[in-house]
């Protein structure tokens, strides 16, 4: 048993999923393109996108300090975007991110799920906590970009 799992109360479900909801003032087609179009994605999330974001494609997201791959599993503009990616540098933990887009009034209701994060595996608890913090920040950046055309990423 890992040190992380040893600290959990008996009977604890050892899988966690990050779930977040965000309302945006743009239509679902616009919001989903911010995820599914490499040029749009690079305006708010990574510094650069290498490759396309087609279903079945492996794409690499590039930041100054890291490179992370995405495998796009499913994409329907205005409805759904699903991909897999690693949370740990050695790729011991790979999660599936499912993002849905639904019309809500004059805008979009975005629902994001990322997981599962196995709390009983080394690095699982830390990756889950990092995902909660990271997705909170990234969804704030998405809102700034889609609703206000503002890039909140830190620049050197």
Feature annotation, model-predicted:
Residues 31, 41, 59, 72, ...:
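Hydrophobic pocket/interface hotspot
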Residues 1-50:
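Hydrophobic ligand-binding cavity/cleft-lining segments
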Residues 89-137, 153-155:
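Beta-strand/loop substructures that line and gate deep hydrophobic ligand-binding cavities in soluble
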Residues 26-27, 60-61, 127-130:
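Alpha-helical scaffold segments that form or flank carboxylate-/histidine-based iron centers
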Residues 45-89:
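Glycine-rich portal/gate segments that line the openings of hydrophobic small-molecule binding cavities
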Residues 15-21, 58, 67, 80, ...:
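Intrinsic-disorder/low-complexity, polar/charged segments enriched in Ser/Thr/Lys/Arg/Asp/Glu/Gln
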Residues 22, 70-74, 95-103:
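Hydrophobic/aromatic beta-strand elements that line small-molecule binding cavities or substrate pockets
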Residues 143-156:
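Short, highly charged C-terminal tails/helix-capping segments
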